[in-house]
């Protein structure tokens, strides 16, 4: 499935792109002990060392740009979160909350940013050091040109500006904040997003001037999550939903019938079943869904930004002294929920999950409680019991995007590259990936195809000017 040429470009040129960026000053480090999603089942998978994450970056180096760069809202975290922890530290948050709190305070005092916020801060700093013009509050309105792209018109506080350019690279993200596009391509409604509110599908609008072709992948291959809303928190004028990876013990996720429908500790197993449609009954059997946990969970682990010792905000959860009472409050089938919890508890006491193999994957174990024999399993036996209704949460990876060539060239309806127009990241269809998903995929393809698109654009300009090729650094590896 997908494009063999694009896949080969990603695999064969990926390390070259990373080496180039490291050479310019991008700080990256492997995450020790963090297994591939599908290890050991997938051929070639590894126990650790394949994931790279940004090194903490001091925002004080950004000067005026420190206030202009986005800081994450902590939506990607299950326990403590924010932009003050690395992924490696997040996996230890459940077992060392005091140490993690000290680390966060220390980072905040030094003005350091981690994860995506740290990556962006580092890249902006690299660009600023080299005199790259970066315009804020300057939306791209339309492209310039007829047979080829010759620039674009951008908006601004006072007037529109006409910018001439030999090439334009669309890196606008997907369309999470466009309800029409989400419904058209993802076939769902009421989806919240971890992305900034500016992600509205501008790439489709801009590229339509040149009859650009779109391509799609299976929605089940996208990074679709479920999340929780903490009352009072908002993002872009909408309720903020924090992504949940329910890898800790003493909790389950159930549908309205009270049944589990996936391995809660490995979100890719339920990211498809949560969105599955039953053609016979003409409904979504696993939606709505609830996060159900007991007092042991509440006393041991944080929920979003809520520490174990803090009460849940009013209206966030249903609370009851029995499973049956909880089901009645939440609107869940009481007999079904009681049967599910009873079976789950009996199996969890033995450290197994014969229904969905929860706790059997090394990747999932890394998000659990390493103090327990099975880091992902523990019974729900301590009242009171809690139920939080979940929301659908997108992460910016979309089923549809612009069709591109192996160097990011936008392809038109006649299957020809549009001269001077490129699309990368989530603006480009994931035709090099097929229907699989792995963390870091969006950033990885953005970095690699951004590098390849820029080189291609520069090489064409160079050839047109000098009539000679640009040498490529094909032998660089990391």
Walk through the language-model features, giving the residues of each.
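An anion/pyrophosphate-binding glycine-rich loop and adjacent beta-alpha core
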Residues: 63-93, 204-336
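Short, solvent-exposed loop/turn and secondary-structure capping segments
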Residues: 33, 40-43, 179-183, 434
């Amino acid at each position: 499935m997908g494009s063999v040429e694009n896949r080969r470009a990603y695999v064969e040129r990926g390390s070259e792109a990373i080496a180039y960026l490291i050479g310019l000053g991008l700080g990256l480090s492997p995450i020790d002990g963090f297994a591939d999603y599908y290890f050991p089942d997938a051929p070639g998978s590894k126990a650790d060392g394949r994931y790279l994450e940004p090194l903490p970056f001091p925002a004080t180096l950004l000067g005026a740009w420190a206030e202009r760069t986005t800081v994450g809202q902590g939506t990607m975290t299950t326990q403590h979160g924010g932009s003050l922890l690395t992924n490696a530290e997040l996996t230890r948050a459940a077992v060392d909350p005091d140490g993690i709190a000290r680390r966060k305070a220390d980072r905040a005092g030094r003005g350091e940013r981690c994860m995506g916020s740290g990556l962006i801060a580092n890249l902006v700093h690299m660009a600023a050091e080299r005199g790259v013009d970066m315009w804020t509050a300057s939306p791209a309105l339309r492209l310039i040109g007829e047979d080829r792209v010759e620039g674009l018109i951008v908006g601004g506080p006072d007037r529109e500006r006409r910018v001439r350019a030999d090439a334009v690279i669309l890196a606008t993200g997907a369309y999470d904040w466009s309800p029409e596009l989400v419904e058209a391509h993802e076939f769902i409604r009421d989806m919240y997003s971890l992305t900034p509110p500016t992600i509205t599908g501008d790439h489709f609008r801009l590229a339509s001037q040149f009859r650009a072709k779109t391509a799609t992948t299976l929605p089940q291959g996208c990074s679709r999550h479920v999340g929780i809303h903490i009352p009072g928190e908002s993002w872009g004028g909408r309720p903020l939903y924090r992504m949940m990876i329910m890898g800790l013990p003493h909790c389950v996720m159930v549908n309205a019938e009270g049944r589990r429908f996936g391995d809660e500790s490995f979100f890719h197993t339920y990211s498809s079943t949560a969105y599955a449609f039953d053609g016979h009954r003409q409904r979504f059997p696993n939606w709505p869904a609830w996060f159900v946990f007991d007092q042991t969970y509440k006393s041991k682990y944080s929920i979003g930004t809520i520490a174990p010792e803090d009460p849940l905000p009013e209206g966030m959860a249903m609370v009851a002294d029995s499973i049956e009472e909880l089901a009645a409050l939440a609107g869940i089938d009481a007999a079904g929920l009681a049967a599910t919890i009873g079976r789950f508890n009996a199996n969890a006491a033995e450290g197994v999950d014969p229904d969905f193999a929860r706790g059997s994957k090394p990747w999932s174990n890394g998000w659990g409680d390493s103090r327990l024999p099975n880091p992902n399993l523990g019974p729900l036996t301590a009242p009171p019991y809690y139920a939080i209704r979940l929301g659908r949460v997108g992460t910016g990876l979309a089923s549809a995007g612009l069709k591109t060539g192996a160097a990011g060239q936008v392809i038109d309806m006649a299957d020809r590259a549009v001269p001077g127009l490129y699309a990368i990241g989530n603006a480009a269809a994931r035709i090099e990936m097929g229907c699989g998903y792995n963390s870091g995929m969006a950033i990885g393809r953005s970095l690699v195809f951004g590098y390849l698109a820029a080189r291609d654009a520069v090489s064409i300009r160079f050839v047109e000017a000098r009539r000679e090729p640009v040498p490529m650094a094909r032998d660089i590896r990391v």
